[in-house]
Amino acid sequence: MKIIIKLSIIFSLFLISCNSETSLQKYFVEKSENKNFISFDVSPSILNVDKTKLSEEQKIALKSFDKMNVLAFKINATNQSDFSTEKLKVNSILKNEKYQQLMKFGSGKEGASISYVGEDDHINEFILYGNKKDAGFAIVRILGKDMNPNNIMTLISIMKDSKINLDQLKPLQDMILKK
């Protein structure tokens, strides 16, 4: 009888630990080697900024930013059904309550959304998702510590004023220029 109880407990723990729920992180890992996708990371070093000239607010925003993960699907004549399938998967993942949507705009054929993971002033991840029926889609995960919406707006202003190191964006540029 004790053996049955122990086995039942172990089996229950095993089932609980096997989370079949797909996250964006799992999706990125699964698709990173798929020929229809391009995947790369962007570090804070992409922003060539003189940190001595940054305001205190800009320094805090930059410190909260760890990296960006980019995953893009470029549509072509042979992968249109894959595009539809993958777009549905991403939409399904983003509907999970873990991802809180800040903004959504566009139509059924194309659009974009901004979501986040975490609490209002302790955001761990911002997700930018955009799709266009005749081009494909891209997902950008902005990862950091204790970010907030103001940090993102400040980072965008830093990006505008920085000399961006385009070498880190070369994989995306190569994909866009491929025919």
Model-derived features: positions:
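C-terminal motif of bacterial Sec signal peptides marking the signal peptidase cleavage site
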Residues: 14-17
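Bacterial signal peptide processing site
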Residues: 19-22
